[in-house]
Amino acid sequence: MAVKGDDVKWKGIPMKYIALVLLTVQNSALILTLNYSRIMPGYDDKRYFTSTAVLLNELIKLVVCFSVGYHQFRKNVGKEAKLRAFLPQIFGGDSWKLAIPAFLYTCQNNLQYVAAGNLTAASFQVTYQLKILTTAIFSILLLHRRLGPMKWFSLFLLTGGIAIVQLQNLNSDDQMSAGPMNPVTGFSAVLVACLISGLAGVYFEKVLKDTNPSLWVRNVQLSFFSLFPCLFTILMKDYHNIAENGFFFGYNSIVWLAILLQAGGGIIVALCVAFADNIMKNFSTSISIIISSLASVYLMDFKISLTFLIGVMLVIAATFLYTKPESKPSPSRGTYIPMTTQDAAAKDVDHKH
């Protein structure tokens, strides 16, 4: 059954708003630390292997989600419940469904590193906002969700606002890179990552809202199945370098912070798609880019211009338009009877019929 974000509250605050705020803060910190970990002075010849970072990210999520899921299981069944009674919930039933988004998310994470290594930060962030539109398209195709003209307009408005904000960075970005840049490779990687992001996010949302296993069990399954493509990437891409230099080559406190933030983001994203929806998650992520730009004023001598202010206003306007409640359909148009629990979930989220 679908869980409405307004029904679940923490100290009177709907969980969907708490999750979205957490995601915004997490993304803001992640963008700054991840970028700095790749351009940190003094580490030009000691860059960490990104495939190892992706694997550690999934391992951390696996441990955290398994611990919380097992704790909830014992709370519901009884503290005398054994671990072997919990394992069938993870590896039984329809757990195989999570192998699909697990593979997609692993590809997306690795493509992000490829894009970031071949594009300036601004170019990468601008192009990556296409995931908002791909998410909306896949929501329509897979969830049969309807978006009104105003919401479509807000999606394009948001994309334009983010583009304006980030384009001004093209003249101020430090041209630091771990190696030679190839714009064609970078743009190709980010475009494919946007398609994968939209498909994986919506598919995961459908699995979460259309089945019975808890959020934490689903995250355990997702992280577990992600380990296989992560290990395959390490073997195919960085095995010889890791064998020569070690698994943790180039690691420092900033790298670990970036990994922890990315792992925490995966958990927060799951909360967002459980209590809100995937497009709202993308709005939160986009707003966090603006916050990161503001933080760059103090950290990287970023200068606010009129262009930046115009972009901020467009993003705020787009967010207002998307979250504005739509008028309910007239009773004379008939009553929609959902045929599946997913139809009911879509109706709960978007108030469609």
Curated annotation (Swiss-Prot):
Main localization category: Golgi
Subcellular location: Golgi apparatus membrane
Signal peptide: none
Compositional bias segments (type: Polar residues): 329-343
Domain of life of the native organism: Eukaryota
Membrane topology, as annotated: Multi-pass membrane protein
Pfam families assigned to the protein according to its UniProt record, in alphabetical order: Nuc_sug_transp (PF04142)
Region (Disordered): 325-353
Presence of the UniProt keyword Transmembrane in the record: yes
GO CC terms of this entry: Golgi membrane
GO process terms (BP): UDP-galactose transmembrane import into Golgi lumen; UDP-galactose transmembrane transport
TM annotation in the entry: 147-167, 184-204, 215-235, 254-274, 279-299, 302-322
GO molecular function, one term: UDP-galactose transmembrane transporter activity
Keywords attached to this entry: Golgi apparatus, Membrane, Sugar transport, Transmembrane, Transmembrane helix, Transport
InterPro entries: Nuc_sug_transpt
UniProt record similarity statement: Belongs to the nucleotide-sugar transporter family. SLC35A subfamily.
The protein's role, per its UniProt record: Essential for the transport of UDP-galactose into the lumen of Golgi apparatus.
The protein's name: UDP-galactose transporter
Organism of derivation: Schizosaccharomyces pombe (strain 972 / ATCC 24843)
Taxonomic lineage from the root: Eukaryota, Fungi, Dikarya, Ascomycota, Taphrinomycotina
Gene that this polypeptide is encoded by: gms1
